[in-house]
């Protein structure tokens, strides 16, 4: 089934008519030319990302230049597994962030965040229950009954490691970003490795995917640019454009609000208009992206630059060449255990 799905997706991307008309602001979709521009921006600002070519000319997408068929970054750390009981450091909750039209659930995306604001963690009292079902007083544990960790001969004091380390400890991932022509947006592929460097069995990669996504939109498929078969976890791009459109719209709204405050003398012009965007993608830090950008050399167009106050209101907070930076923040909400910000360090 996965082979048929992978083959169908490859053929669909290769033979779907290519659009060269930009609809970035209206649909969240990008053209192949815009994908290349966004990839150039990503590799320039974050050198851990690089362009790569297909293994053979027959594997190339004809509408992308040779040598720029996909983007790749390697050795991305992943220190924790996500299972049904995943709660992060202090408990996490999954919240559906709806699209700007407030439509069906499929038009939104899940985000993980601290649950302390809505469901405080509480320590429950432990009491004894006798055979008749009567609840007794709280039982006090005698300190003498606690195993001594320094007692090598005490079998109770020994902490035994689990025999199977495939689902524990540090993993690393190689991440790939391709262009999905059928959906006119990027697509993420992920290939995992165990702490000893051995390839991670494909089904175990699902342990690093947020539950609702791995049940619905994440599949195991062959990477289309390799001559040999390599199974990877892939986030299906069917909803990427609508999610990106929502993120872009909210970034624009945040920028517009800040400009209005600045005109009223209530704000500073030093920060970039990303507040709404950051909030909607689980408050992930994007400061590194525009901190590097504002240091553009004199005479050059500043990356992530603030738009002058006298420009038209239709100016946007995020340019199309910055698209993949935002895309990676969205993907980070799908795989919160994978340290995507590691790939965005200089």
From Swiss-Prot:
Q: Where in the cell is it found?
A: Cytoplasm
**Where are the residues of the annotated region Handle region?**
242-322
Gene Ontology terms: cellular component: cytosol; mitochondrion; phagophore; phagophore assembly site
User: Where in this protein does the record put region Flexible region?
Assistant: 85-161
Q: Is Protein transport among the key words of this record?
A: yes
Coiled coil stretches, renumbered = none
This chain's protein is named Autophagy-related protein 3
Q: Which family does it belong to?
A: Belongs to the ATG3 family.
Annotated active site: 238 (glycyl thioester intermediate)
Q: Name one Pfam family in it.
A: Autophagy_act_C
> What's its job?
E2 conjugating enzyme required for the cytoplasm to vacuole transport (Cvt) and autophagy. Required for selective autophagic degradation of the nucleus (nucleophagy) as well as for mitophagy which contributes to regulate mitochondrial quantity and quality by eliminating the mitochondria to a basal level to fulfill cellular energy requirements and preventing excess ROS production. Responsible for the E2-like covalent binding of phosphatidylethanolamine to the C-terminal Gly of apg-6/atg8.
Its gene name is apg-3
The organism is: Neurospora crassa (strain ATCC 24698 / 74-OR23-1A / CBS 708.71 / DSM 1257 / FGSC 987)
* Assembly with partners or alone: Monomer. Interacts with apg-6/atg8 through an intermediate thioester bond through the C-terminal Gly of apg-6/atg8. Also interacts with the 40 amino acid C-terminal region of the E1-like apg-5/atg7 enzyme. Also interacts with the atg12-apg-4/atg5 conjugate.
Q: What molecular function terms (GO) are annotated for this protein?
A: Atg8-family conjugating enzyme activity; Atg8-family ligase activity
**What's written under domain?**
The N-terminal region is involved in phosphatidylethanolamine-binding and is required for apg-6/atg8-PE conjugation.
């Amino acid at each position: 089934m996965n082979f048929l799905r992978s083959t169908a997706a490859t053929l669909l991307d290769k033979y779907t008519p290519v659009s060269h008309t930009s609809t970035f602001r209206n649909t969240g979709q990008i053209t192949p030319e815009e994908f290349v521009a966004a990839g150039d921006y990503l590799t320039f600002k974050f050198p851990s990302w690089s362009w790569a070519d297909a293994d053979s000319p027959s594997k190339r997408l004809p509408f992308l230049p040779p040598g720029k068929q996909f983007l790749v970054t390697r050795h991305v750390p992943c220190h924790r597994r996500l299972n049904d009981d995943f709660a992060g450091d202090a408990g996490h909750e999954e919240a559906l962030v709806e699209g700007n039209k407030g439509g069906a659930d499929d038009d939104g995306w899940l985000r993980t965040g601290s649950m302390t604001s809505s469901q405080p963690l509480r320590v429950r009292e432990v009491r004894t229950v006798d055979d008749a079902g009567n609840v007794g007083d709280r039982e006090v544990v005698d300190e003498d009954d606690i195993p001594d960790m320094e007692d090598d001969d005490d079998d109770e004091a020994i902490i035994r490691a689990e025999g199977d380390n495939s689902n524990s400890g540090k993993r690393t991932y190689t991440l790939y970003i391709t262009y999905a022509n059928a959906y006119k947006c990027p697509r993420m592929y992920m290939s995992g490795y165990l702490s000893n460097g051995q390839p991670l069995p494909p089904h175990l990669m699902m342990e690093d995917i947020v539950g609702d996504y791995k049940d619905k939109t994440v599949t195991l498929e062959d990477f289309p640019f390799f001559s040999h078969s390599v199974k990877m976890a892939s986030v299906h791009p069917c909803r990427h454009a609508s999610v990106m459109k929502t993120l872009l719209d909210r970034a624009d709204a945040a920028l517009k609000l800040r400009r209005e405050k600045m005109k009223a003398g209530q704000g500073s012009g030093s920060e970039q208009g990303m507040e709404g965007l950051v909030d909607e993608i689980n408050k992930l830090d994007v400061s590194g992206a525009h901190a590097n950008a504002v240091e553009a050399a004199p005479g050059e167009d500043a990356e992530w630059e603030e738009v002058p106050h006298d420009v038209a209101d239709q100016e946007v907070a995020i340019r199309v060449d910055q698209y993949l930076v935002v895309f990676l923040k969205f993907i980070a909400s799908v795989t919160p255990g994978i340290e995507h910000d590691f790939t965005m360090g200089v």
